[in-house]
Amino acid sequence: MAKTPSSRAAVEHRERLGTRMAGIASDLWNIASKTRSVSIVSSPPGAGKTTTLVAICVHALATGKRIGVACQTNAQADDVCRRLKAVIKPQRICRFVSGTNAAPPPFVGCPVEKSALNVAGGPVVVVGTAMKWALIESAPPINLCIVDEAWQMAMATFLPLLRFCDRFILIGDPGQIPPVVSAPTQRWETSRNPPHRAAPEVLRARLPVHEASLPATWRLPFDTASLIQDFYDFPFESASLEGERSVTFDKVSSKGTPVVDAALDRLNRHSIARVLVPMPTAGGLAQSDPDVAAAAAETVVRALARNAKATAKDRGIELKKLEPGNIGVAASHRVMVQSVLSKLPSDLRGLVKVDTAERWQGLERELMVVVHPLSSMENPGEFDLETGRLCVMASRHQSGLVVVGRDHIGDTLDGILPSATQPLGRPDAVSRGLRQHRAFWSHLDKGEQSG
């Protein structure tokens, strides 16, 4: 096991990060309070985006301002309201809902309004989905609009916000899955203002924006921060130090597949392990790949059979026994999700969350089992090389990650020659994705070689 840092060093490390985060929130408000501006805040996974948002709201309310918060989903909006309640009087928080939304308020005492005209006067934080804000015809003045999970918002969804505010702070994770647009987008690919692209990407290219980035991931263990660093164009670290997070397992008499047990044992020393399934000697690979699905399911079953226990010294957790609800499985395709579910014992289905990368966004578990997106792909296409899904899946764990896949992935990545078919003037997303995939796989290779 890695050497555990002294408690003093660990405390000072996290105090330093907390001070930096507080300074970033203060600076963002100072910029927004002085002039019309757009600030873009890039965040690694689990870096305190909502904490930063709440801190900015506190600064703004203290000076009598009105803030609008545009979230991407109702669940995100409710979560923001609950987080605000911890530091702001409930009457200064308003949950903005659609006319057909019959959901209860996110907490007792939180005003819920269907019309912007009914929102109370004076300092207030109005929280709603971006789609709800887009439908507003008129509203009382908003001094600052904060966009939560901004890289999930298409530029077309951002534009209506300009009708009632001229100061914006966009906070989000640029490694996440790009906005989902159902309409054909080919005609906009060469546009200077592509409406289907993530709003921060377009604004950054067209306007003088203030840039900031959150300094650390508070969710991910020390060595996972370096694993996913290549998905981002800004540096960050982990709030946990080397040796503070681990998952340990009992030695039991029942026998499991050696490669699965070896991967689990590795989590006592590192936060990342890998289970490789040999390529079949004959025939091709199916998207449902029952062998890989079985390996992913067995990893979950063996972790529970061997009484998995998580330690996170930075969070005050010592040998917490993991229940089925503390373990998750992620895959990039629904077909593989169903295949894994079919291999799980019936008593674990519904207790262990098994879902696609899209549905894992914003969630976390102590231990994650991830089916590598290229595992069943012998000839990956552009969709397969897009790294948002891999980044999401590889950043949901708090203590341990097991990547499951076929053993051809490294050779497949080495054999890909990008075709550079991107539209004129657009970045070569395929080559970028290929570089990131190779860096990710190389990191796993080096980790295993280091023991």
Task: Identify the residue ranges that each predicted region occupies.
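Pre-P-loop entry segment of helicase/translocase ATPase cores
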Residues: 1-38, 99-114
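Helicase C-terminal subdomain and adjacent C-terminal extension
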Residues: 2-10, 26-31, 187-209, 379-451
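ASCE P-loop NTPase helicase motor core
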Residues: 16, 31, 38-105, 129-238, ...
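Short, well-ordered alpha-helix to beta-strand connector turns
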Residues: 36, 64, 122-124, 142, ...
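Short, conserved catalytic or adaptor-binding loops enriched in Gly and charged residues
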Residues: 87, 115-120, 199-207, 263-270, ...
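Conserved RecA-like ASCE ATPase "motif II neighborhood" in helicase/translocase motors
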Residues: 110-161, 355-358, 371-392
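Conserved helicase/translocase motor-coupling segment
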Residues: 240-342
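Conserved helicase C-terminal RecA-like lobe
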Residues: 305-330, 335-395, 399, 404-413, ...
